[in-house]
Amino acid sequence: ADTIALDAYRNAEKQCRQLLIDYEIKRENRVIDSDNTGSFFRFVNGKLSCKRGLGAINDDKGGVVTGDVERANLLNDYFTSMCVDDDGKTPAFDQVVSENLENIHFTPETVHAAIKQLKLGGAGGPDGFPPRVFKKLAVCIKDPLSLIFTSFMSVGQLPRDWKHAVVTPVYKSGAASSASNYRPISLTCVACKLMERVIVKQTLGFLRKHGVINAHQHGFLSGRSTTTNLLESVNDWTLAINDRKSVGAVYIDYKRAFDCVSHSKLLLKLRSYGISGQLFNWIANFLQNRTQQTRVGSSLSNITDLTSGVVQGSVIGPLLFVLFINDVACLFNDSSCVCKLYADDLKLYTVLESKVDCDKLQSKLNEICVWSDTWQLKISYKKCNFMYIGNTDCRVNMLLNDNVLQLVSDVKDLGVTVDAHLTFNKHIDQVVARAFIRSNLIHKCFVSRDVPTLLRAFLVYVRPVLEYASCVWSPYHVEQIKQIESVQKRFTKRLKGFETHDYKSRMSLLGIESLEIRRLKQDLIFTYKIVFGLVNNAASDLFTLTSSVNVNRTRGHAYKLFPHQNRIDVRKHFFSERVINTWNSLPAETKHFSSLPVFKRFLRDVDLRKINKTLIF
């Protein structure tokens, strides 16, 4: 009887395991068959992520908090403790724009356009209405919403519920038991976000018209990105090294900058930028009397008031912060020092030829400290760094409010590890190691051995790691090109049925390109954006058209670029130099350059190996 029962148990266990496998395969296929790339990424991220749920949190007294409500309250108290009390001072701030933007016009068309921008699978706010509801009912609700938004704008007020946020704590880095290592991401009402979206679009149009936002700010603005920020910086640095000079670069970190924005000081700046009337009143009301509570699991913390800051998770918050920090770049208008911003990520640098240049850099650091104190932004001195780029004999300590900056040989700059000699060796090692880990996890964690499933997971979860900001650091050494390519080579070789094919055959059968060719195409696409003014900042100075320097052009297209003579490899192989030969060798037909989508289709069909003979893969 025991033997019969054991056999029955084993058969039931086997059937149960098979049912679970079948269920998981169906679940994987259901997500894979959908066209929603975002949903697929979240699915893959959920399967492969090693992150665990929120664990125990240490309180101020050294105790350990484990309950959901207790952890929610502890985190919420920490987040609100970052708020600053206004010091009551009104700094001098000159009027920047003489014209005013007093009102925002809401029409059914502008509201409908805002609804279309919502992500179907996005999270809902405290009122429980997710974006899906608004998208499904867009045609029905666009008219009444436009009337509601117009009414709120005319009185300069918002409903109380729209000023409440439910915060999700997002782990950053460091000890997971410390509340300081979590970032608050606020979920606010979707209806309010729609209104904000219309406001932001029209406000940005006004600000661009009057040239308000500094050209060195790259955060949250169309045509600007982390890549444009990095390209402009590395361009300056490679030029200096090519001229046998060095660079001193300082990275400044602000502590919880978004949470520390003084409302009264922000409103002072908005007035000087021409924001007035009903719009000014609405923004003032948007900032005032805000509340939040933090969610852990299914539990919510107590509700607390927010006395400063702009909401992370709102639509208008990033723009308000950009305007608040905007004038810090004005400190460098008449200076040999250069400032680059990405939201609150600030770096400043200067070419060093003598100790006088070090003194000038120190002088600007002193001005940064005064500016930060005036506007009540706290500098996190321990996270600030100083790096010499290139070889120099001028080595001195740099100070921020009497704090000696840590001298480093490499630094993480907007996700790219930049070293003192601009080799990017460490960055390439890091991204390849990370990509291999993710690649191995895909083979390990997916139940299905289906090739399209695993390949799509690789394309959305691994390949972006190897391609982020590649225009900045794309390698030219054969060993590094092979090192990066090895990730895709090894992954495709492990796919079922592809073990015996060579790499070129595997790519052809799978319909993918080598990572080397993809980096070249990204170079060409970014060049197109710069040449045709789709990147609206100083990155446009990276190239010179041959037509503008009186160079005879007997063959080729009308957008050829002027090449330069360079002394060292890091300049010869920098983006704006390495791409020129390939760009100038593109076919002469101007139809290929009529628009960016047309140019991308052209690149999809052209064989770049026939144009660039140096390609390895």
Residue ranges and their predicted role:
Residues 79, 125, 164-167, 183, ...:
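Catalytic palm active-site di-aspartate
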Residues 199-217, 300, 318-349:
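Active-site palm subdomain of RNA-directed nucleic acid polymerases
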Residues 79, 97, 103-311:
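Conserved pre-catalytic core of RNA-dependent polymerases
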Residues 39-181, 186, 190, 194, ...:
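Surface-exposed loop/turn segments and immediately adjacent short secondary-structure elements
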Residues 1-66, 117, 441, 459-466, ...:
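Arg/Lys-enriched, amphipathic patches
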